[in-house]
A protein has these predicted regions:
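Bacterial N-terminal signal peptides
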Residues: 9-16
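Serine-dependent protease modules
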Residues: 22-234
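Bacterial N-terminal signal peptides that target proteins for export
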Residues: 1-8
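Intrinsically disordered, low-complexity regions
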Residues: 1, 14, 64-67
């Protein structure tokens, strides 16, 4: 009976020790880190002119009808304004912003919102469609808080990460998760070595940063796998 008590006591100590060790790897809160990083993350909105052919008939075809596309080419071309949303992050105090190229591609006007309230016009100073990276310059003399960069090669599967961006136009949104996989290739571009995360990623997050727990950028949120988002690739 005495031996059983000793073994039971030892087992309880071991379970308690393992639980404490595991809990050290789980952040109690992301609040302090998010508060520090959010001023460096921006919301991007773009407008561009799109030319489409109109229906030449005075009546509308039923939605999804094959005749709708068939006869559109005979209609008169019509210009309309199209808008898009995305995210980005500041890499220099002089207002230099990095985002995805597909966020600003063919844009006529680019508006960048910083810290949730200040808006600035931006111009493209560099773009590479192959890597899907673009660099913007904010048209202002103000100083900003740039991000710090980490080493994505040191990021491990299972590490905690947070994504900050502008999903659905809801700026300043923070989500968290872990690195689910590395070295993903999904056929998006010539250069592919993506990190997969289960942090919630949705439309408008493109171009936003993926941070490690030290507050360093280790990736750019680029793509969503799945009909309803949530599986992030960057």
């Amino acid at each position: 009976m005495k031996k059983f008590k000793i073994y039971l006591f030892s087992l309880l100590i071991l379970i308690s020790f393992n639980t404490k060790s595991f809990s050290k790897g789980v952040p109690e809160s992301f609040a302090d880190l998010a508060e520090k990083l959010m001023p460096s993350v921006v919301n991007i909105s773009t407008t561009q002119t799109v030319v489409t052919n109109t229906n030449p008939f005075p009546f509308q075809f039923p939605p999804g009808s094959p005749f709708e596309d068939m006869f559109k080419e005979f209609g008169a071309p019509q210009e309309r304004k199209s808008s898009a949303l995305g995210s980005g992050f500041i890499i220099d105090e002089k207002g230099i912003v990095v985002t995805n190229n597909h966020v600003i591609q063919d844009a006529e006007d680019i508006i960048v919102r910083v810290n949730g309230d200040k808006e600035f016009k931006a111009t493209v100073i560099g773009a590479d469609p192959l890597s899907d990276i673009a660099v913007l310059q904010l048209e202002t003399k103000e100083k900003f808080i740039p991000v710090s960069f980490g080493d994505s090669d040191k990021a491990r599967i299972g590490d905690w990460v947070i994504a900050i961006g502008n999903p659905f136009g809801l700026g300043g949104t923070v989500t968290s998760g872990i690195i689910s996989a590395r070295n993903r290739s999904i056929g998006l571009s010539r250069y592919e070595d993506y990190i997969q995360t289960d942090a919630s990623i949705n439309s408008g997050n493109s171009g936003g940063p993926l941070f490690d727990m030290n507050g360093n950028v280790i990736g750019i949120n680029t793509a969503i796998l799945g009909r309803n988002g949530s599986i992030g690739i960057g």
